[in-house]
């Protein structure tokens, strides 16, 4: 039986994170600074400007997001400086996208907003009301969604489409994960402080950067040092606002020099020497280790036995009608109705004759929205209506099992991991080059 085909979907990280928000002390402090700062130019970016009003609006959103995530909100001046630098990078990319003729039409924006609403169990009008009730203007929300889609297309054109992964790299990666020490492979959670110093920079500039990095290293090594705070205040990496936290990484996804350095560290320790990387200097702290969760390090994959009911949209049935019908069906199933009978009667998928049964599905065999919803379900649980490009689905998980991954599946996993690592590094390099080639004048003193 043919499975639901995969397709690439763009999701808006910024707008998706602004769902449940509350007023913050930082936002109130910003308003207290007075309206006189609202139209002040805080940055010149090539032939464009960023105003104080734009900055304060974005800072308010970020502060509320941090509060929602129960993360500490930095002091107002520090947060404004960090957000302004983010906005400068964003504005430069938007300018480049426009120069490249990249546009995002209204239909694409609406489709993305629809997926965000569906992911939160709402229809679009409900989602809009929720966003506005939290103090976020809907037109700003839509504009940010369009911007993120534009920048995603720009990155695909300028960076991701140029990434190649050879069969030799795949073979080497799999060998490193499945070698004699595969059973003891550990993922590493690291924090880092980055000081920019491209290899092609004048030697005098490299010397200045190295001196700065050495000073920061001594601060990081000092007894009682707060590495996270130091990274937030001093790191020149994009993740500075997160305290330089890289999350868990497999050794194969990290530069070999970094892996070698942290192999000698205990959790909580800072590497005592600087690490020279192509575009600067790294100060690294090992936070913790854990058993590897990289699928390529194990021949096992988790398969899911799943069935579904699909109602297509546009065949005499509107979005709201399809969704409401599935809500009604789900209610009957929850009250003791037979999922299989409902699937045979109502489903518009080829699996209807089998009661909606798709059999055992491996990771990556379904469209992302379907797989994400499926992965959140317990055995026997029925999902709320899930929107994909095919229509609306009710999904029920019947069971899960460990299975041997095929050679091709392991190769695909390895290729994806290598490609992601190379793409992230290439994107970081490309952003720095784009920033260096742009005219930027920061007029906000604390951001300098």
From Swiss-Prot:
Protein's GO biological process: Gram-negative-bacterium-type cell outer membrane assembly; protein folding; protein stabilization
Catalytic activity: [protein]-peptidylproline (omega=180) = [protein]-peptidylproline (omega=0)
Signal peptide boundaries: 1-27
Domain PpiC: from-to ranges: 185-288, 301-399
Function summary: Chaperone involved in the correct folding and assembly of outer membrane proteins. Recognizes specific patterns of aromatic residues and the orientation of their side chains, which are found more frequently in integral outer membrane proteins. May act in both early periplasmic and late outer membrane-associated steps of protein maturation.
Protein name per Swiss-Prot or TrEMBL: Chaperone SurA
First-listed, main subcellular location of the protein, grouped into a coarse class: periplasm
Gene3D superfamilies: 3.10.50.40, Porin chaperone SurA, peptide-binding domain
E.C. code: 5.2.1.8
MF-aspect GO terms: peptide binding; peptidyl-prolyl cis-trans isomerase activity; unfolded protein binding
Keywords: Chaperone, Isomerase, Periplasm, Repeat, Rotamase, Signal
Originating species: Burkholderia pseudomallei (strain K96243)
Location in the cell: Periplasm
Pfam annotation, one family: Rotamase_3
Entry note about domains: The PPIase activity resides only in the second parvulin domain. The N-terminal region and the C-terminal tail are necessary and sufficient for the chaperone activity of SurA. The PPIase activity is dispensable for SurA to function as a chaperone. The N-terminal region and the C-terminal tail are also required for porin recognition.
Recorded superkingdom: Bacteria
UniProt-listed InterPro entries: OMP_Chaperone_SurA, PPIase_dom_sf, PPIase_PpiC, PPIase_SurA, SurA_N, Trigger_fact/SurA_dom_sf
SUPFAM superfamilies for this protein: FKBP-like, Triger factor/SurA peptide-binding domain-like
Enzyme class: isomerase
A single Gene Ontology CC term: outer membrane-bounded periplasmic space
């Amino acid at each position: 039986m043919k499975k639901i085909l995969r397709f690439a979907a763009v999701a808006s990280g910024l707008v998706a994170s602004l769902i449940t928000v509350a007023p913050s002390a930082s936002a109130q402090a910003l308003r207290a600074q007075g309206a006189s700062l609202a139209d002040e130019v805080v940055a010149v970016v090539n032939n464009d400007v960023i105003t104080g009003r734009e900055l304060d609006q974005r800072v308010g959103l970020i502060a509320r997001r941090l509060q929602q995530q129960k993360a500490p909100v930095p002091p107002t001046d520090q947060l404004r400086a960090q957000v302004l630098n983010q906005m400068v990078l964003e504005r430069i990319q938007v300018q480049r996208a426009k120069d490249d003729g990249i546009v995002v039409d209204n239909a694409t924006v609406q489709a993305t907003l629809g997926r965000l609403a569906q992911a939160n169990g709402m229809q679009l009008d409900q989602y809009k009301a929720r966003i506005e009730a939290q103090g976020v203007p809907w037109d700003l929300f839509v504009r940010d969604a369009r911007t993120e889609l534009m920048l995603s297309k720009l990155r695909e054109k300028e960076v991701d489409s140029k990434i190649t992964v050879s069969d030799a790299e795949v073979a080497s990666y799999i060998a490193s994960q499945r070698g004699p020490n595969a059973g003891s492979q550990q993922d590493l959670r690291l924090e880092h402080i980055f000081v920019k110093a491209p290899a092609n920079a004048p030697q005098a500039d490299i010397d200045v950067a190295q001196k700065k990095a050495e000073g920061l290293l001594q601060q990081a090594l000092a007894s009682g040092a707060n590495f996270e705070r130091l990274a937030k205040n001093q790191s020149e990496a994009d993740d500075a606002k997160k305290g330089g936290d890289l999350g868990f990484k497999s050794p194969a996804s990290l530069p070999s020099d970094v892996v070698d350095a942290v192999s000698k560290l205990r959790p909580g320790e800072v590497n005592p020497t600087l690490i020279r990387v192509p575009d600067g200097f790294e100060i690294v702290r090992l936070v913790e280790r854990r058993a590897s969760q990289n699928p390529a390090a194990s021949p096992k994959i988790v398969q899911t036995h799943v069935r579904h009911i699909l109602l297509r949209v546009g065949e005499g049935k509107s979005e709201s009608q399809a969704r409401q019908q599935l809500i009604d069906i789900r209610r009957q199933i929850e009250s003791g109705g037979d999922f299989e009978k409902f699937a045979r009667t109502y489903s518009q998928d080829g699996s209807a004759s089998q009661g909606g049964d798709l059999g055992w599905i491996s990771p990556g065999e379904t469209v992302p929205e379907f797989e994400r919803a499926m992965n959140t379900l317990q055995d026997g649980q029925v999902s709320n209506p899930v929107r994909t490009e095919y229509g609306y689905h009710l999904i029920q998980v019947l069971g899960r099992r460990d299975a041997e991954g095929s050679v091709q599946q392991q190769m695909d996993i390895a290729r994806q991991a290598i490609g992601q690592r190379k793409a992230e590094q290439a994107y970081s390099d490309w952003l720095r080059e784009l920033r260096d080639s742009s005219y930027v004048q920061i007029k906000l003193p604390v951001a300098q």
